[in-house]
Structures are given as C-alpha cells and as structure tokens.
Amino acid sequence: MVLSQRQRDELNRAIADYLRSNGYEEAYSVFKKEAELDMNEELDIKYAGLLEKKWTSVIRLQKKVMELESKLNEAKEEFTSGGPIGQKRDPKEWIPRPPEKYALSGHRSPVTRVIFHPVFSVMVTASEDATIKVWDYETGDFERTLKGHTDSVQDISFDHSGKLLASCSADMTIKLWDFQGFECLRTMHGHDHNVSSVAIMPNGDHIVSASRDKTIKMWEVQTGYCVKTFTGHREWVRMVRPNQDGTLIASCSNDQTVRVWVVATKECKAELREHEHVVECISWAPESSYSTISDATGSETKRSGKPGPFLLSGSRDKTIKMWDISIGMCLMTLVGHDNWVRGVQFHPGGKFILSCADDKTIRIWDYKNKRCMKTLNAHEHFVTSLDFHKTAPYVVTGSVDQTVKVWECR
C-alpha cells in the first residue's frame, strides 16, 4: 500500500513528535533532518500524541473486526443449520450470543457472584478481594466499590425494590447496605464460620443465610436479630434460596443433599439425595417454566391442580438435576459439563436452563428434549456465577479469571 505525499508527511511529523516527546533527542534530530521537516508550534500541537492515537485506534478496529467476524461466522452457522435467523426469534427464546458485549476488569481476585439490579441498569459483583463493585451493564462503565468486609465476599442479594443489598462473607458476617446512599446499614454476627450464601426474603422483612457452620439462619432486616436457625445438614451449606412466595427455602450442601424447609415451622419438607458429590447451587423454577416442565416430564397436574414447585440443583458430579418438590422426586438429569457445575438458572421465558461451570463454559439447555443446545466458551478460567436479567436481554457471568462479562441475548 503506497502512501500519498500528504499522508507520508503526516506520518513523518507524527513519528517526529513521538521521538521528541519520548526523549529520543538524537534520533529526533537525525530523523527531522533526513525527512526535511520544519517543525513549528502550531504543527506541533496538531501532531501531539498522534502516533499513539493511531496505534490504539488500529487495535480497537482489529478487535471490532474480530467481533464482526465472529458474529458473521455464527450467522453462517445458523444459516447452514437452518437456525432461526431468517424468522424473528421470540424474545422468550433469546439466548446469549458470543462474543461478549463487555469484559470488565477491576476485581483483584476471583469473582464469586454476579447479579442484576431489579430496577436500574446496573449489576453488582462480589469477589474474593473482599469488595463489592457496581457497574452499568448497558455502557460497561464501573460505578463504585462497596468496602466493609474483611475477607472474601461470597454472595449478594437485592430485595425486590433494589433499595437494599445484602452481602455475606468468609469474615463470618452478613452486611445490609442502603443501595441508594451506598452505605452499610448494619452488620450481623452469629455464624461460627464462613457465610457462603445470603438471600433477602420476597417480603423484604427477613434475610436468610447459609454457612460452613452447617446451619441456615434467618435474620430480621429491621433489627439485625437472628430469629430462626435451621439445622439438619451434616456439612458446609453452600447456598440457600427462598421460593417466590417465601413460604419455603431450599438449601444445598457438601453433604451431597438438597433440602427444602418450611419457613413457618422450620421443618425439613424434603431431603433430596441423588447427587454423588457436593451440591454447589440451586434455583427455583419460575411459573413461566411449569408448562414446559409438565410437557418434558409428562408429569400430570396433581390433584390440587397446581404443578410444582420445581427446583434445579447443580453439583460437583458435573450434572444438573430437576426436582418436583411436592413428591420429592428427581424429574431429570442433564449431563454435559466436563467439570463442577457452579451456577444454574431458568431462562425468564421458561423454556431453557442456563448453567455455568468449572469447564469455563456457559451452557444453554433445551430441557424439554434433555439436550445441550449451545455451549459458549465464556472465560479463561472457571465460571463461578451467572445471572439472567428478568426483562432486558442480558446475561452476566463472573469468573476466577477476575473478569465479569456481559452477554447480549438475541
């Protein structure tokens, strides 16, 4: 490619500016003489930093080209496999597509949990670096850091309004944050070991937490007092999640079981024992999934007329299981991940399940046909957490590679 005289002149001036501003005086004077440049102040200003700017914009363009090539290849793939690119996909069937929209760095240790805000276009991430970070998922901008924990932050949870954020940590505490003023409202002490999971109950009055001390505790938001303790697990309790109306909570543990508890009485309603290793994660099925689950499992509607509730669990045995809690039965097992399953969630549309694992992938499951329909190589290291936005077409993932990635769905 041949440069015009004007382009050559511009390039020479930009090189001269670069040599001079970086202290290569000798090279600068020789180059200036050989290129026959007469540098004056006005020109100097015009060419200041130009070479670096060109250089970075070339890198940016290369990245964009690679992204577009990747999108084009995906479109070709869908076209040849007769995928739904011609007809418009129903948003209920949108799934995350590579490449990621943003790869965000800022955490200095593995990312442990990622969640979307229920109202605003922000997401929150927790990390082993003892911080919680807030990001705008639409622009990819970092907004702020919440500091207070003194050890790895293990889990975070919003109330339904998004005004309160709960966090828990290996420092054995639970913190409640005002998400409008971004200050810590109170700190709850009571667990005797690493607090691995936290969730604000649907009514917003209570918080549940799970710990390596083998217990689950319920706390009053207003006072910070512990009002209930659920005991029964024989090992570290990894995760606790309330169902939609807050009458039940599910928990999973290193004892390889999933338990479902009745909140009012503290009794264990079900103990589910089919996993063959530590159960890392659980997720309740939204009502939007009930009809697909019934089709998939052929389970007739119960006499009471209402199906479910259903629960997902993901384990270090590399499988995902779906359970019908009303009968305490495993309805299906999804096999495909090559390593520990770390996160599992229903697609808001109800037709798919998303999971992430230590095999560095996100997988999208068409569970009606019990098959993995898409695998995304998501991170450079274990994928620890994922969240699917309830209304906007975004998925967020966090990883041991210390990055957070935002994926657009279409």
UniProtKB/Swiss-Prot annotation:
Residues 56-82 form a coiled coil. One of its GO terms (biological process) is germ cell development. WD repeats lie at residues 106-147, 148-189, 190-229, 232-271, 274-333, 336-377, 379-410. One of its GO terms (molecular function) is microtubule plus-end binding. GO terms for cellular component: 1-alkyl-2-acetylglycerophosphocholine esterase complex; axon cytoplasm; centrosome; COPI vesicle coat; cytoplasmic microtubule; kinetochore; microtubule associated complex; neuron projection. It is found in: Cytoplasm, Cytoskeleton; Cytoplasm, Cytoskeleton, Microtubule organizing center, Centrosome. InterPro entries: Coatomer_complex_subunit (IPR050844), Dynein_regulator_LIS1 (IPR017252), G-protein_beta_WD-40_rep (IPR020472), LIS1_N (IPR037190), LisH (IPR006594), PAC1-like_LisH-like_dom (IPR056795), WD40/YVTN_repeat-like_dom_sf (IPR015943), WD40_repeat_CS (IPR019775). Belongs to the WD repeat LIS1/nudF family. This is Lissencephaly-1 homolog. It comes from Xenopus laevis (African clawed frog).
